[in-house]
A protein has these predicted regions:
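Hydrophobic helix-and-loop "lid/oligomerization" segment in the mid-to-C-terminal part
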Residues: 2-222
Length: 224
C-alpha cells in the first residue's frame, strides 16, 4: 500500500534527523496529511492512541514524541529494531499490539533516564565556543547521538560523542549547527584516523580506534 509507505517514509525522515527540504519536506507533508486522515497501519494507530495523539499530528509530534519512541528500542537493545518492525507490519488481528506499543513507550522512558544520568556525569564548563569531542566508555552505543544532540543544543557548537564498543573501537555520533555541514567536515579529516563514517549535514555516525581520539579531536576542531 503506497499510503502506508508514505507514512513510514515520513516518520523515518524525521526520526533520522534528515534536513526537511526538497523531497524530504514533501514526504513529511504527505505523511502528516495521511496520518491526520486516519490512514495509518494498525501498529501506528495503537501507538498514537497510547500517546493520546489522535487529533492533529504535527511535525513536532513526529520529531519529539513519535520518533524518539520508535528509535529508543533499537538504541538500547541489540534486537530492538525488530520489535519496532513487528509493530509496524502487524495487522488488526494481532491482539498484543496495545501491549507491544506500551512496551515501546516504557523503553523510551528508560532511554530518557539513561540519557539524564549520562548528561549529569559530564563535567563541562558553563560556556563552550569551540567544537566539542567527548568520550565515556560506559555510555553505550545507543545514546551517544542523544548526548551529542543535547550538548549541541546547549552550547550551539558541533559535537561528537564517543563510547567504547565490544570490539574495543570507539563508536561516535555527531550533531551539528546550521552553517557547519558535518558530512563535509568528516570528509576533510585524514582518512587514516577514521575507520568508517556516514550521515548528512546535521548528523553523522563514525568509528575510530581509541588511540586516534586525541588526533581526531584536533582535526575535527580544525575542520569545523
Amino acid at each position: 500500500n503506497l499510503d502506508d509507505l508514505k507514512v513510514l517514509a515520513a516518520i523515518a525522515t524525521i526520526a533520522d534527523i534528515m534536513p526537511l527540504k526538497g523531497a524530504n519536506r514533501l514526504l513529511v507533508q504527505d505523511g502528516l496529511k495521511l496520518i491526520n486522515k486516519g490512514r495509518v497501519v494498525p501498529g501506528l494507530r495503537h501507538l498514537l492512541r497510547k500517546l493520546k495523539l489522535e487529533e492533529h499530528i504535527t511535525e513536532d509530534d513526529f520529531a519529539f514524541t513519535i520518533g524518539p519512541i520508535i528509535n529508543a528500542s533499537g538504541r538500547l537493545y541489540d534486537d530492538g529494531a525488530s520489535s519496532v518492525l513487528d509493530i509496524f507490519v502487524a495487522d488488526w488481528r494481532d491482539y498484543q499490539l496495545p501491549y507491544k506499543c506500551g512496551k515501546l513507550i516504557d523503553i523510551n522512558e528508560e532511554r530518557k533516564k539513561r540519557l539524564r544520568n549520562a548528561i549529569d556525569s559530564i563535567d563541562l564548563p558553563t560556556h563552550k565556543s569551540t567544537p566539542l569531542v567527548i568520550y565515556d566508555p560506559d555510555w553505550g552505543e545507543g545514546i551517544v547521538g542523544l548526548i551529542a544532540g543535547k550538548l549541541c543544543e546547549k552550547y550551539h557548537v558541533p559535537v561528537i560523542a564517543f563510547t567504547r564498543t565490544k570490539s574495543g573501537q570507539l563508536k561516535g555520533s555527531g550533531r551539528s549547527i546550521p552553517g557547519i555541514h558535518l558530512k563535509n567536515v568528516l570528509d576533510s579529516i585524514p582518512k587514516d584516523i577514521l575507520i568508517g563514517y556516514g550521515g548528512h549535514e546535521g548528523a553523522e555516525g563514525l568509528s575510530i580506534k581509541k588511540e586516534n581520539l586525541k588526533r581526531f579531536e584536533k582535526e575535527f576542531e580544525k575542520a569545523c
